[in-house]
């Protein structure tokens, strides 16, 4: 392999693709999760209990789950740039439209429609990156992509808190300004996507002929060794036990990602009631700054050492243990520090997980597998927010719900160790089938 050709190609991709993809995901995550900040004002204006808020937060995932796999199947047929552009334009319109709701039912409907519009975006981007990046660079690429999500909280939470201060401007509530102003960028970027992204390396005019040839040959060689590949269709994903085991792990991890993210400002406000909404949003953003750091370090170290198992399983298990300590800590500062580390470690496995997954699946079956895994994980978003809200209404505390999250993370970490070891073995031996191993 020509090291200069390898380095120059990857560097060009990192400059051209990754920053743009990070911005797209940053906007996506802000629009999906800004309801957590809006709730600081919106719940009172719409007379919503914690359980009703949980329903509004969770109903997004009903449609998101239903349309996830079909969306990714369509993406493989019409091309990534067209479909991702469509997703962003429609979700931008709906996200901004949430500023018009007058009742909890209208909010439920708009959140449901937001899930329809956004379905397929995350797995679509993951599939897109797997079509460009060789295995040796994939975990780092995935970590940079998901840093966009963590940055959405680092930047988006304080930004959303600031927008709430527009309350009363032109007679409009702050949370309505929040939905309106944060929905517009998605619409505009959706148009840019169509003209900026290329569907495949072969079509990338910004790569030289030699770079295009090398990258295409490298990816084709790796894909030929992949268990679920171009010679399978989307139905293969539903029949492969390995895909379902990966789905279980991602579901357990999602209890932490979704459960904590959607309620973090409310949790912080509950223990720091004297703080302003802006300061609450800042305190809620700090854990995601650590998530950015942990994801990059864990992803890069995994690529350099070519080790997946410990990088996948250990952070989750430690995150679960730290969350349990935070729950029972009597010191608020210590509890907050432990919560920060919990969030960071929970997110740290993200690039490793998708590197392991995309080392196993490619093609139409791969796109469907990625979408299926993501859809199953989002069941946590459907079920857990209403349950978490109900627990808060009944017990006046989130502790019982957070214990569930901690146990899910510990169990998920144990599964991650097993999956990581099996994946390392299969990649090393270049096996052609995974179904016999599960």
Language-model features, listed with the residues they occupy:
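Cytoplasmic membrane-interface "Motif A"-like loop-to-helix N-cap segments
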Residues: 76-88, 303-316
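Extracytoplasmic gate region of multi-pass secondary transporters
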Residues: 35-36, 235-296, 350, 354, ...
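C-terminal transmembrane helical hairpin of 12-TM major facilitator-type secondary transporters
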Residues: 306-356
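Conserved MFS/SLC helix-loop-helix module at the cytosolic interface between two early adjacent transmembrane helices
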Residues: 66-105
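Helix-breaking motifs and short loop linkers at transmembrane-helix boundaries and internal kinks
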Residues: 47, 79, 100-106, 117, ...
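Cytoplasmic helix-loop-helix junction between adjacent transmembrane helices
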Residues: 110-147
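Helix-to-loop junctions at the C-terminal end of transmembrane segments
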Residues: 67-79, 294-307, 392
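Glycine-rich segments within core transmembrane alpha-helices of 12-TM secondary carriers
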Residues: 140-164, 185-186, 374-384
